[in-house]
Design a protein with these regions (language model features):
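Hydrophobic, well-ordered secondary-structure elements that form the walls
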Residues: 19, 144, 160, 213, ...
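Solvent-exposed residues in well-ordered beta-strands and their adjoining turns
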Residues: 20-22, 107-109, 128-130, 147, ...
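Flexible, surface-exposed loop regions and adjacent strand-edge segments
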Residues: 49-53, 86-93, 143, 173-181, ...
Length: 274
């Protein structure tokens, strides 16, 4: 299976080419190769810009019933640039880097179905281990999502997200390795606009976590099958500045409540929140 993809957002441009064999030599193990180029422009909000080009390969297989293990390796060349708004510490991280990481992914999937899930849970843990790295950054990510039908045609979802990034050698992690909460994890806030600041720049943290609760309202638009309306409550935080602990004075939990709309189209779901 060959897939080429170009993704453009407000801050990123990503192009990738992926080759996947879902049943390599009838072993029930998938093998994949990925080549990608990624540009992330955070000059306005965070004072830096990064260009990353590299490749990765790995395998994924079912270890036990509903338990999947993924093993892989990523290598990439990265160039980090800063602008005049960046602090002296940020500017010191500008330069060129070559990194290689080993990846481990553990996935326990008890959902009743992958598309429009209504029952079960999904538990996922991943770790990136540095092999060749100037900063020796170790990244851990854990996501747990629980689905339940509280009453007829209702789907209630609870999700927990936690991520950390720290250097094994007590160095400062790179600007591009610092953690930001995705907009989908803390709706109502600008993506990346939460957590520690260095001057006027949001610089991300060494740690991030969030809790999301969402429940559908089937009484609204009951005759439209491809649109779901729901209420949500999000709460999250980003904290930790390894290169200057005095900057971590924005260590506060943010929260939001609102209405979400999911439109299930042929090209995938489209979401909006108010």
């Amino acid at each position: 299976k060959l897939v080429s993809e170009l993704t453009v957002s407000e801050e990123t441009i990503k192009g990738q080419f992926n080759v996947n064999n879902p049943n390599f030599r009838n072993s029930d193990k998938s093998i994949n190769l990925n080549v990608q180029s990624l540009e992330t422009d955070k000059l306005t909000d965070s004072g830096y810009k990064t260009n990353k080009t590299g490749f990765g390969f790995g395998t994924n297989f079912e270890y036990q019933d509903d338990v999947f293990i993924g093993l892989g390796q990523d290598s990439y060349y990265e160039k980090i640039e800063t602008n005049s708004s960046a602090s002296t510490r940020q500017k010191s991280q500008a330069g060129n880097y070559w990194d290689t990481f080993l990846n481990l992914n553990l996935n326990y999937d008890k959902r009743n179905q992958k598309y429009r899930t209504s029952d079960g849970f999904l538990s996922n843990y991943s770790i990136n281990l540095p092999v060749i790295s100037e900063n020796n950054s170790l990244t851990n990510t854990y996501v747990y999502t629980l689905y339940n039908e509280l009453y007829e045609d209702n789907v209630t979802k609870f999700s927990f997200f936690a991520k950390s990034a720290n250097s094994l050698t007590n160095d400062n992690i790179k600007l591009s390795e610092r953690i930001y909460l995705p907009g989908s994890r803390l709706r109502g806030f600008v993506s990346g606009g939460v957590g520690p600041k260095d001057g006027n720049d949001f610089i991300g943290g060494n740690y991030a976590s969030s809790i999301n609760i969402q429940t559908s309202i089937p009484q609204l638009l009951p005759n439209i099958q491809n649109i779901d309306v729901s209420m949500f409550l999000d709460a999250g935080n980003v904290w930790g500045v390894d290169y200057d602990s005095s900057l971590d004075d924005t260590n506060k939990i943010r929260s939001s409540i609102g209405i979400g709309i999911d439109w299930f189209t042929l090209i995938g779901p489209l979401s909006a929140s108010f």
